[in-house]
Amino acid sequence: MEAHRLDGHDHGLGHGVVELDICFACQGIWFDHRENLKLSPQAVVELFTLLHQHRTYERRPLQRQLACPRCVRPLAPSFDVVRSGRYMVYRCAQQHGRFSAFSSFMVEKGFVRHLTRAEVDDLARRVDAIYCTGCGSPVDIRKDHAC
């Protein structure tokens, strides 16, 4: 993972900075406890730009068991819900933070939403396959929605 410093919200305590750990190969971001909420709107745009600049990195699938970078204990898969949909994150039981795939982060921030059943059916009539946002593998949308 690479560390990147982005602007945080200024809560009257001076200019805040948020340091995120980003894995471009596995397309994931480690957020220390509640760090995802501390990003300023400009920092979210900066982060999307950074992710776009590294879009050609060779991708690695996520490991079956992810570990907290602070305590090395296993992360537990869980879901969060926002207006744009439900998305998966991997949490540390010790509340050190969470790991989020780039695609989940985009859902969290409202830039991406899940397709409705009617939209999936319409897309399945027009295309044979879509590609996994995690590993890039083709997915037959007529049968599956994820790899």
For each feature predicted by the language model, list its residue ranges.
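Cys/His-rich microdomains that often coordinate metals
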Residues: 1, 30, 75, 98-99, ...
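Short Cys/His-rich Zn2+-coordinating modules
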Residues: 2-10, 45-56, 72-79, 112-119, ...
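Short cysteine/histidine-rich zinc-coordinating motifs and their immediately flanking basic loops
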Residues: 6-15, 35-43, 80-86, 104-108, ...
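Short, flexible, mixed-charge glycine/proline-rich loop motifs
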Residues: 13-17, 53-65, 82-86, 119-128, ...
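Residues immediately within or flanking Cys/His clusters that coordinate Zn2+
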Residues: 20, 28, 65, 89, ...
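Short cysteine-rich clusters marking metal-coordination/redox-active sites
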Residues: 23-26, 68-71, 92, 132-135, ...
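Short, structured motif recognition centered on aromatic/hydrophobic residues
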Residues: 28-31, 36, 91, 97-105, ...
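Terminal recognition/anchoring or ligand-binding modules at protein termini
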Residues: 94, 109-111, 122, 137, ...
